[in-house]
Amino acid sequence: MNPYGNSTLPSGVRSRRINNVNGLTVHLLEAGYEVTGRPVVLLLHGFPELAYSWRKVMLPLASAGYHVIAPDQRGYGRTTGWDDSYDADPDPFRPLNMVRDAMGLVYALGYRSVVSVVGHDAGSPVASWCALVRPDIFRSVVLMSAPYEGVPSLPFNIANGAAPPRPAPTDDEIDAQLAKLERPRKYYQRWYRTREANDDMMRAPQGLHAFFRAYYHYKSADWKANKPFPLKARIADELAKMPTYYVMDRDKGMAETVAPEMPSAAEITACKWLTEAEVGVYAMEYGRTGFTGALQGYRVRRGDDPKSMAELRTFSDRSIDVPSCFIAGKRDWGVYQTPGAVDRMQSAACTQMRDLHLVEGAGHWVQQEQPDEVSRLLIGFLQHQAHVADNREK
């Protein structure tokens, strides 16, 4: 097997494996490991990404005095111990077990807490649950691209006549609405739960490398039509205003969806935030593992999954009470794909929301597109929390 990153990792970022982490052998990248006793920052990637997606911010964080840890999450990359079959039990990918994965890694490395857990895209809900469930371990949280809107509530006071909460439309209900539009559409997260999704992307007619290049380009600030805005409601007519990487044409898979947005040779040459060698890392790793493990989370962590809903209702009415920050690209539709989520995050779900930053010149891949600015924002947030903690101790 080739070295992780195909020699594109920055010097000072190392790759290693840790055994016996909640049933996994976890592959991780780390920086700032040379000095013991440093405060820890845990970085959780999204889909279709890897620990590798954090490579550009790890050294700046390490230079600021942190031990920086970025694992390939369950289902991804070179972390092993999960089943790559669509017919496998998806329960290990449920919210609380993903929290146990994060806890197990922190403990295995000899730490009792981290100063912050940072999650991007599909890593954002995992980071949210970590901060919600174990604030004693995860002392602050930074969410990127995917806002946290809180846990599902248990019906309150219904014995005395109060109306039960009105459930939000499920992905299946939204998908059925989208199918009835004049231009029939489908919701990408609903499609990601299907058996066909893995084969569609693995066997992309354009090849896996070209698939990743087009997919990353289409969701980045380089695709000039990414001009997101708040949607009025989670209904088909509103959701259909988003690009097809989120609300796909009904008759197309993701490979066919992104193919027309393949950048030109000149655009690829001009793309300094994601070189051809770096695209090759994603193509190599996913070419080896497939997408099924990474997609399992969509099957069990969406809001209409009964088991996950029941699991999360244990924390009904509980908020994230550790210091929180939200960072996303200014041209990232992920901020708005769930209407009202940002407002709920700021007003109720996170009681200590310190900052909300929309970064210029970035789409969905904010820490890769604008790593210097993201590093600056992360370090500023972390140093502010350290300053506040120092003042409390005086």
Language-model regions: role of each:
Residues N2-R17, V26, V40, Y76-V118, ...:
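Flexible "cap/lid" subdomain of the alpha/beta-hydrolase fold that forms the substrate-access gate
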Residues S15, V68-A70, L356-L358:
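Conserved beta-strand scaffold positions in the cores of enzyme catalytic domains, especially
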Residues N20, G32-T36, R318-I320:
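Short, flexible hinge/linker loops that cap or flank conserved catalytic cores
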Residues L24, L29-D84, Y107, H120-A122, ...:
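Conserved HGGG/HGGXW glycine-rich cap/lid loop of the alpha/beta-hydrolase fold
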Residues T36-G37, A64, Y111, I320-D321, ...:
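Residue-level preference for short coil/turn positions at secondary-structure junctions
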Residues Y52-R55, M103, S128-L132, S375-I379:
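Short, hydrophobic alpha-helix immediately C-terminal to the catalytic nucleophile
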Residues Q352-K394:
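Catalytic active-site module of serine/aspartate enzymes centered on a nucleophile-bearing elbow/loop
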